[in-house]
């Protein structure tokens, strides 16, 4: 919902404009359904509710101070030189669903006892029902020296995890011809856990195209113990890593970057390592920052002890405040935080919200479906699809075989089809992930 602290100076003019606009909003407003966050989850929820015949009179509001909406899965394409930044962003005002009231307000806390959200602009917004979709914070400042390195174009340090840094990734890949390249993934929960290695595989592929691959020593340094959380795909990616001569530095979490000395410092998380510091010299460094719940969410009454909005993993309903639901990256749903996951969460949330409004039992169930279209090079992609428990749930296995094998068809889905689908169907409430444009049955059939 907001700019990363490390990049906030660039956002100041927009904030002044929003404060001016907000003065025309009454100090107190009320809507039947209030959605906090106009990212993929919030927009899609608003659109599906607005399209729903079960809601009756539509009175939906969405709160988000952003001026631009980003198709974040497209940032890997931008960093790989396959798309321009303009291709993967739109003015937020252009994609708010018709009939939905947009308030460009910055929420700073939730007041669930009074069915209210409070904003920095002094406006209190009350609701009958709340959908919390605040997203998460990409914490660039969580790595010492990283913000400064990212602001120096000569540092050879870059990241696909912000619209303000992603274009530098492709420039760095093109300019790099020889030396030590390190790609990092932090420990803990992040958005799209496959993205840190997607950009690595695409860089490797580009360097191979340019004939310089043999002059570059590549390391994948991850805080995780394996290449991927789902065993089936992790095994395939580990085989690919070894086949392509990529060094694996597992359970090593990046904690500091010295751009001048070209040194990255990691904390060894392995059992018995006692958190020892490990330093690695680099000539090229791609960093994925640590990520966490927004502080204002974590400190609120609707957050659990881990800081995420505390909801039932099957119904998406809050565990304490029954008129609150949460989806997307800011929720406690224990799955991969991806756009594909949101495509499966929203219909469940909508059906359960409508059931609650009608005084009925909440029967819709989210099974944890998520997908990671994992680029492994030009003209190839591993389409990882799975549900809770790391159980594969593959859409195209009957056609192409097991999806752990990279496929050119999947590559063009990611590169050409999915961006079009996102802008023309997904955020308009007409896309349902593996069900495509057919709305899924969200209530499990009784055997």
Question: Where are each of the predicted segments found?
Answer:
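Short glycine-enriched, charge-decorated loop/helix-capping segments at active-site entrances
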Residues: 75-82, 147-148, 155, 302
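C-terminal auxiliary extensions adjacent to catalytic cores
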Residues: 383-447
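FAD-site-proximal beta/loop scaffold in flavoenzymes
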Residues: 150-177, 281-344, 354
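Internal hydrophobic alpha-helix adjacent to the cofactor/substrate pocket in enzyme cavities
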Residues: 205, 342-368
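Beta1-alpha1 glycine-rich phosphate/pyrophosphate-binding loop at the start
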Residues: 25-101, 187-231, 437, 441-446
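Short glycine-rich anion-binding loops that position phosphate/pyrophosphate groups of nucleotides
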Residues: 41, 135-138, 291-293
């Amino acid at each position: 919902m907001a700019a990363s602290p490390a990049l906030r100076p660039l956002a100041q003019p927009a904030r002044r404009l929003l404060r001016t606009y907000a003065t025309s909003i009454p100090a107190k407003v009320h809507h039947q359904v209030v959605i906090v966050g106009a990212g993929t989850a919030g927009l899609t929820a608003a659109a599906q509710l607005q399209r729903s015949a079960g809601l009756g009179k539509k009175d939906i509001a969405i709160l988000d101070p952003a001026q631009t909406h980003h198709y974040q899965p497209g940032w890997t394409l931008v960093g790989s030189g396959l798309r321009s930044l303009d291709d993967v962003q739109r003015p937020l005002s252009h994609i708010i669903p018709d009939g939905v009231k947009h308030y460009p307000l910055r929420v700073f806390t939730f007041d669930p006892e009074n069915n209210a959200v409070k904003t920095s602009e002094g406006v209190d917004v009350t609701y009958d029902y709340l959908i919390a979709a605040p997203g998460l914070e990409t914490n660039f400042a969580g790595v010492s020296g990283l913000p400064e390195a990212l602001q120096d174009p000569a540092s050879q340090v870059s990241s696909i995890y912000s619209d303000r840094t992603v274009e530098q990734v492709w420039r760095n890949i093109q300019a790099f011809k020889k030396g030590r390249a390190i790609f990092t993934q932090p420990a803990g929960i992040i958005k799209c856990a496959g993205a840190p290695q997607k950009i690595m595989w695409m860089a490797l592929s580009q360097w191979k195209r340019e004939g310089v691959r043999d002059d570059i020593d590549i390391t994948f340094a991850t805080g995780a113990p394996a290449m991927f959380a789902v065993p089936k795909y992790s095994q395939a990616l580990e085989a690919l890593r070894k086949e392509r001569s990529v060094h694996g530095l597992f359970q090593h979490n990046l904690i500091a970057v010295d751009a001048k000395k070209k040194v990255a410092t990691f904390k060894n998380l392995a059992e018995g390592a006692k958190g020892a510091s490990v330093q690695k010299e680099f000539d090229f460094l791609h960093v994925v920052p640590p990520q966490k719940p927004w502080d204002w969410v974590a400190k609120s009454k609707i957050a659990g002890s881990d800081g995420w909005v505390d909801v039932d993993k099957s119904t998406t309903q809050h565990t304490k405040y029954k008129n609150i639901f949460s989806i997307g990256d800011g929720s406690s749903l224990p799955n991969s935080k991806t756009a594909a996951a949101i495509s499966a969460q929203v219909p469940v949330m909508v059906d359960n919200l409508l059931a609650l409004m009608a005084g009925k039992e909440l029967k819709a169930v989210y099974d944890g479906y998520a997908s990671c279209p994992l680029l492994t090079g030009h003209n190839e992609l591993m389409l990882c699809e799975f549900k809770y428990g790391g159980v594969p749930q593959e859409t195209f296995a009957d056609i192409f075989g097991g999806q752990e094998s990279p496929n050119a068809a999947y590559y063009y889905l990611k590169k050409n089809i999915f961006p079009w689908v996102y802008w023309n169907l997904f955020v308009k409430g007409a896309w349902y992930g593996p069900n495509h444009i057919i709305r899924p049955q969200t209530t499990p059939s009784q055997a």
